[in-house]
Design a protein with these regions (language model features):
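A short, well-structured edge-of-sheet supersecondary motif
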Residues: 20-58, 114, 126-130, 280-282, ...
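Active-site-proximal loop and beta-strand segments within enzyme catalytic domains
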Residues: 51-156, 325
């Protein structure tokens, strides 16, 4: 039976809903779990398959998705924001203050959050290193290019550094901090870094790792484990709805103050271009009055858009990398949506 308001939601967002359903109908993704909300009214769907290789398994409600880079904004950004509110960290602090192994004194915490740090560099045999070796390589084998403060260049290294900075401040791994400071207070009981395989939606089938299920698809997160602030989180549609409402309606149930949440919806770079960045989030602009809407995606096929001013949001969870990550059709369809 439909809840009050669902019919109206279905009518109002019919083109968006049709586009999301087409992802499964056209075989672009094996399955999809999505939700649209407008104030207190929600519309959600779960359809398709969790797995199609080596066997077919129907998608079930409450299955946990590998969120990939949504980990950054759901977990790491709030931890850093809480540290800033507590006076343990400043946006203007140089990265080097907390990570002295990193030898360039110019990039700041704000640069990391907005992907304007210019930090880059190739790490040979990256996926074959141990966690300790990989962390050391990221701290000592990166350099800062000419894009510092001049260009937004999205890079995981920024959030690896933020995770390690939080670890320096609190003496705990970033993933344990996310658990204690964000997930536990918000009662996000279906969100975890260590899901049971049977409850999780599979991602890629790889020659080296076989069917990836219940462990992070991201190779850095797979190696670094609890010390990874850029990926590794698993969650459900229900928990992401809980998080989304909390962020735009109650400042994450009071975990963040008004000023801090304002910064999440404000351009922090003032760099000309198609898209700007707030603290962690990509900014889109409403068609009618150009107010800021926040958005973030994950490589595995996840996507979150939130409009605080209109109290609206969309959560899209797919495993578009199953059975292979070579799936440009999904990226094209997502951009059209």
């Amino acid at each position: 039976m439909e809840r009050m308001g669902e019919t109206g939601m279905k009518k109002q967002y019919r083109e968006t809903i049709a586009g999301l359903n087409r992802l499964v109908e056209q075989g672009i993704v094996p399955g999809i779990s999505y939700a649209l909300f407008d104030h207190g009214i929600e519309y959600r769907e779960v359809k398709g398959y969790a797995e199609i290789q080596p066997k077919k398994e129907p998608l079930r409600a409450k299955m946990q998705y590998d969120l990939a880079s949504l980990t950054k904004v759901i977990g790491t950004v709030p931890v850093i924001a809480i540290a800033i509110q507590a006076g343990k960290l400043k946006l203007t602090d140089p990265v080097q203050k907390y990570l002295p192994e990193f030898k360039d004194s110019r990039p700041t915490i704000q640069n990391l959050l907005t992907h304007t740090s210019g930090i880059c560099g190739y790490i040979p045999h990256r996926d074959e290193l141990t966690a300790k070796e990989l962390k050391q390589a990221y701290l000592t084998q990166q350099h800062v290019d000419s894009s510092l403060n001049r260009q937004i260049k999205y890079a995981d290294v920024n959030f690896l550094y933020l995770g390690w900075i939080a670890e320096k401040i609190y003496g705990q791994s970033i993933q344990s901090l996310i658990q204690s400071q964000v997930l536990d207070p918000l009662r996000m009981k279906e969100t975890t870094f260590e899901p049971l395989a049977v409850n999780s939606v599979p991602t890629e089938v790889q020659a080296k790792r076989g069917l990836i299920r219940g462990t992070a698809h991201d190779p850095k997160a797979y190696v670094l484990g609890a010390e990874c602030g850029c990926a590794g989180m698993f969650s459900t549609l229900d928990d992401l709805l809980l998080y989304s409402h909390a962020l735009i309606e109650t400042n994450l149930n009071g975990l963040l103050d008004d000023w801090m949440v304002d910064q999440l919806f404000k351009d922090q770079t003032l760099i000309p271009g198609e898209h700007s960045r707030s603290l962690g989030w990509k900014l889109l602009h409403a068609v009618n009055d150009r107010h800021c809407i926040i958005s973030h995606t994950g490589f595995t096929g996840t996507w979150l858009i939130l409009d605080r001013e209109e109290d609206q949001g969309m959560i899209v969870l797919t495993n578009r990398v199953h059975p292979t990550a070579q799936n440009n059709a999904y990226l094209q369809a997502r951009d059209q949506l």
